[in-house]
From Swiss-Prot:
Family statement drawn from the similarity comment of this UniProt entry: Belongs to the pyrroline-5-carboxylate reductase family.
Protein name, as recorded: Delta-1-pyrroline-5-carboxylate reductase kk1I
PANTHER family: PYRROLINE-5-CARBOXYLATE REDUCTASE, PYRROLINE-5-CARBOXYLATE REDUCTASE 3
Main function: Delta-1-pyrroline-5-carboxylate reductase; part of the gene cluster that mediates the biosynthesis of KK-1, a novel cyclic depsipeptide with 10 residues which is a promising active compound with high activity against many plant pathogens, especially Botrytis cinerea. Within the pathway, kk1I catalyzes the synthesis of the L-pipecolic acid residue of KK-1 from delta-1-pyrroline-5-carboxylate (P5C), a metabolic intermediate of lysine.
SUPFAM superfamilies: 6-phosphogluconate dehydrogenase C-terminal domain-like, NAD(P)-binding Rossmann-fold domains
Taxon lineage: Eukaryota, Fungi, Dikarya, Ascomycota, Pezizomycotina
The encoding gene: kk1I
Amino acid sequence: MTKRESNTLAVLGCGMVFLVSLLDLANRLLGALGTAILSGILASMADQTADDSGRLFTNFTACVRRKETGAAVSDKISSHANANKVEILNKENLRGVKQADAVLLACQTHLYKALFDEPGMREALKKKLIISVLAGVTTAQLEAALGNGEDYFVIRAMPNIACFVRDSATVIEKPQRTFPEALLHVTDTVFKAVGNVFYIQPSAYDICTALCGSSPAFLAVFIDSMVDGAVAMGLSHKDAVDMAACTMRGAASLVLESGNPWTIRHQVASPGGSTMQGLLALEQGNVRSTISNALMVAAKEAKKLGSKENA
């Protein structure tokens, strides 16, 4: 990928994201995730100066399969100052890829082979960065579907829905073969624009898919449960949501600072106090084992997604 005055990031069909030139985006909505990544990158651009040498993208292209999807993407990003930098293409995946320097693949897991099979697609993808955010699909599977893996630069990453607010915990799989440093830098820059980045070995990828990708839903259930309890005792729903969410955010900040969640637990739960009684109620409900099991089930299911592709 060469640096130019104008570069394009492309997000292609079903959430398949391609870095088209370095600063333009061709985007297809992958449920919420593809839009979240695009939205986060657009927001990050507002923080950068016009002469910022670290900025990779200036334009974006969203490739969608339905007009209504394109309208939804347009509506979602309309509040961003750089929304006019996004071009939306309907049923023009190949055009989006040809314009791209790199690709963020964010389609539904079972659709990626069909995308690769589109006439001219494999040739258009050659020698370009392909960032896959497909749960359960390994780099080897993607390279096999493309044909000759040596002709493509595929890297796996798993961000989460917090890309929308630029606070994602994104895991990136360390490449197992020689990979151009420039392309690693692009991958790193894309996801640092929308949050924090962690590099992991392939063996830990499915675990981290659950921990980083699925757990926002688990944490939302926990917040919702606290809200229900507060509302049942008379607090307004809005106040309960705001307080619970801010409290969880503050607790997370304390854990990051201390490096140990038990530190927070012991600081808050004084002997004989109300917090300790509440903690005992959680233990009686097997909350710890239930949460741990939910994470393990999600990790196993993430692994199965890739296995089904090979069945």
